[in-house]
Amino acid sequence: YDCVTNHLKNRFGFDFTISNELEFSRSVATGEVKIPSLFLSDDQSQCKHDYCKLNALINICSRYEVDLKNTLVIGDGENDICCIRKAGIGISFCSTNVMVDSVADYIIKKRDFQKLIPLVR
């Protein structure tokens, strides 16, 4: 979620992050999520998912001339498999999907975002 990725961005000096936006009402998470438009499928998409992090990753890498090997992707669901596979570093975070785990470079099973810190340094 953006509340976590923005914290990591600020702490480690990333240029930017893209993630689902967790909605809050009166400082309490509602459970609703906004999906960035860069995730949405279009005629250039390389996968069949309606929304996919790979769409955003390819778009951003192309726009800023970044090699895919210099990217890090965190995912937990089937719709993340194609992006985890293409990223320079793919992380399965608390996934119950064996395919996600099988394509990831790193697997984190404990729901603890602190486990990500050594991987982004």
Specify the residue positions occupied by each region the protein language model found:
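C-terminal cap/substrate-recognition subdomain and adjoining C-terminal extension
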Residues: 1-121
